[in-house]
């Protein structure tokens, strides 16, 4: 079996927020982009999708069709752990334990911020693909809350219309 790879693929405002103070990401739709900012190519390369419960619930308010139905989907949730629904398996516990118990090898960490912090604390993110939107929100839900440093190496910078996508490799080992 090859080594599992976890990628955080996410959009942020220029000031580092992944959502506004109400948890909405509608501000992303108002910005001109060039194509899908590499999303389809990224998505085609993952076999597993993981997110927090709030992010999972928000998806259903944004679309009528669940966009990840062809992938293995896991949702971290303390209240629903051990259950599943039509689209996802609900899990709890440590990231490391979860990673050791899944078959997937190319994993997309969708978010939200709390789950990102958990993955960061366990040094479980291998690659950061951060797409920066040309907007300053002023406040909202920050991508990073932890005050600990993380050593990263810039691998690529790509422009998609008004968006800048930065890809970093995590230099810290789990």
Tell what function each PLM region has.
Residues 1-174:
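Enzymes that bind and transform nitrogen-containing heteroaromatic metabolites
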């Amino acid at each position: 079996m090859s080594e599992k790879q976890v990628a955080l693929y996410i959009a942020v405002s220029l000031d580092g927020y992944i959502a506004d103070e109400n948890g909405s990401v509608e501000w992303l739709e108002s910005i001109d982009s060039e194509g899908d900012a590499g999303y389809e190519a990224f998505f085609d390369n993952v076999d597993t999708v993981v997110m927090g419960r709030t992010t999972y619930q928000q998806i259903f308010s944004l679309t009528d069709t669940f966009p990840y139905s062809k992938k293995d989907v896991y949702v971290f949730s303390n209240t629903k752990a051990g259950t599943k629904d039509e689209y996802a398996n609900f899990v709890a516990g440590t990231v490391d334990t979860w990673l050791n118990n899944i078959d997937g090898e190319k994993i997309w960490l969708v978010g939200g911020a709390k789950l990102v912090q958990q993955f960061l604390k366990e040094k479980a993110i291998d690659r950061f693909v951060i797409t920066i939107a040309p907007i300053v929100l002023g406040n909202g839900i920050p991508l990073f809350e932890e005050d600990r440093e993380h050593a990263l190496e810039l691998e690529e910078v790509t422009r998609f219309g008004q968006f800048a996508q930065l890809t970093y490799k995590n230099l810290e080992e789990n």
